């Protein structure tokens, strides 16, 4: 007999142990909207007119309960939030060695014009082709406000939407999977692509691996998982404070990359600012400290800038599903590629990230 889990089990195993990645999977799949992040709080003040008072939460990096979980209050079977989390004690996330399963590793770049592309623009090109061919009907990505750099979960519904959202800054202010509920439960999309850091893709893998009936609509809707190489992400407020202290305004930032143990920030005037990772460690999210996955081992395709020169992306095609999306984009002239990729450079960061987890 399956034990009934609730957000309280999730809180005990993940939230209270600083293991939460902030992906937002639990928030997205909760059928009664019981969970929320402080940044998305449904109540901004205390109300004296009713008994249902939700006091604004303290500053924490994990979700909070609005205290109307049906499992806790009425013993209604659910467990959706718990079963969607990739960081519970007994998750479905595999732990392969090194780079994991790879069918093919290539150096690639987009053949179409992409404004604000992160390096080779490969992810955007794959999604653009997929929209053109009707392979997907939506894509969950992150998009930032070019003035404030505030990131937000964005549901792209067309090729034009994807082109508009190109580029990533590795900042966190809200869960990337916030748009998942909108895509599946409101828009009723059936061919979704999800692009995110390894923690986000692990959450999707966890959902796809679950037999919880409440997660079935999400399992049936997700078609493609693309992971972005990630060493760590930063709390938006803390990083903006750091930039401001150094005389940098958010609107001046064009892109952010982690290269050779440094956070490299490229400004719109062409200048670059570099920080040693230890100098921005205070801005790193706590959940990143327990993550040893640099490339996104559970994805269909992993993409990053390590192992190739400027203007290109390293692409790790992990299965036949991912290969199909990549090859169709190549066939239709969206991407060019060759096999001149330095996997040793990628492996070094893979091992470095794993060592950091063991050290902590």
UniProtKB/Swiss-Prot annotation:
Pfam annotation, one family: FrhB_FdhB_C
Entry keywords, A to Z: Iron, Iron-sulfur, Metal-binding
Signal peptide start-end: none
Keyword Iron-sulfur assigned: yes
Cell wall biogenesis/degradation among keywords: no
Cross-referenced SUPFAM superfamilies: 4Fe-4S ferredoxins (SSF54862)
GO molecular function: iron-sulfur cluster binding; metal ion binding; oxidoreductase activity, acting on CH or CH2 groups, with an iron-sulfur protein as acceptor
Domain called 4Fe-4S ferredoxin-type: residue spans: 11-40
Similarity remark: Belongs to the FrhB family.
PANTHER family reported for this sequence: 7-HYDROXYMETHYL CHLOROPHYLL A REDUCTASE, CHLOROPLASTIC (PTHR31332:SF0)
The protein, known as: Uncharacterized protein MJ1349
Originating organism: Methanocaldococcus jannaschii (strain ATCC 43067 / DSM 2661 / JAL-1 / JCM 10045 / NBRC 100440) (Methanococcus jannaschii)
Upper classification of the organism: Archaea, Methanobacteriati, Methanobacteriota, Methanomada group, Methanococci
């Amino acid at each position: 007999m399956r034990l009934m889990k609730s957000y309280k089990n999730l809180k005990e195993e993940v939230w209270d142990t600083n293991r939460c990645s902030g992906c937002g999977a639990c928030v997205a799949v909760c059928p009664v909207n019981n969970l929320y992040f402080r940044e998305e709080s449904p109540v901004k003040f205390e109300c004296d007119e009713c008994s249902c008072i939700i006091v604004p939460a303290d500053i924490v990096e994990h979700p909070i309960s609005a205290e109307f979980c049906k499992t806790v209050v009425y013993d209604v079977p659910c467990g959706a939030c718990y079963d969607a989390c990739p960081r519970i004690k007994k998750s479905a996330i595999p732990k392969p060695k090194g780079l994991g399963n790879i069918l093919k590793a290539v150096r690639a770049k987009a053949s179409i014009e992409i404004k604000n592309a992160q390096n080779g623009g490969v992810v955007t090109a794959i999604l653009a082709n997929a929209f053109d061919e009707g392979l997907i009907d939506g894509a969950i990505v992150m998009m930032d406000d070019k003035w404030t750099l505030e990131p937000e979960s964005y549901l792209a519904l067309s090729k034009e939407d994807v082109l508009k959202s190109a580029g990533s800054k590795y900042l966190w202010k809200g869960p990337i999977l916030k748009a998942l509920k909108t895509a599946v439960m409101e828009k009723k999309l059936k061919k979704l692509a999800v692009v995110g850091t390894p923690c986000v893709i692990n959450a999707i893998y966890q959902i796809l691996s679950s037999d919880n009936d409440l997660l079935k609509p999400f399992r049936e809707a997700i078609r493609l998982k693309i992971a972005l190489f990630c060493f760590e992400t930063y709390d938006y407020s803390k990083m903006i404070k750091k930039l401001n202290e150094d005389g940098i305004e958010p609107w001046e930032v064009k892109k952010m990359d982690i290269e050779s143990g440094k956070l490299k920030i490229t400004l719109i005037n062409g200048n670059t600012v570099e920080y040693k990772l230890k100098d921005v460690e205070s801005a790193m999210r706590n959940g990143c400290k327990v993550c040893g996955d640099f490339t996104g081992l559970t994805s269909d395709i992993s993409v990053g800038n390590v192992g190739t020169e400027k203007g290109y992306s390293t692409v790790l095609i992990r299965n036949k599903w991912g290969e199909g999306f990549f090859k169709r984009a190549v066939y239709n002239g969206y991407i060019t590629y060759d096999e001149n990729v330095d996997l040793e450079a990628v492996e070094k960061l893979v091992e470095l990230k794993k060592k950091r987890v063991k050290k902590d």
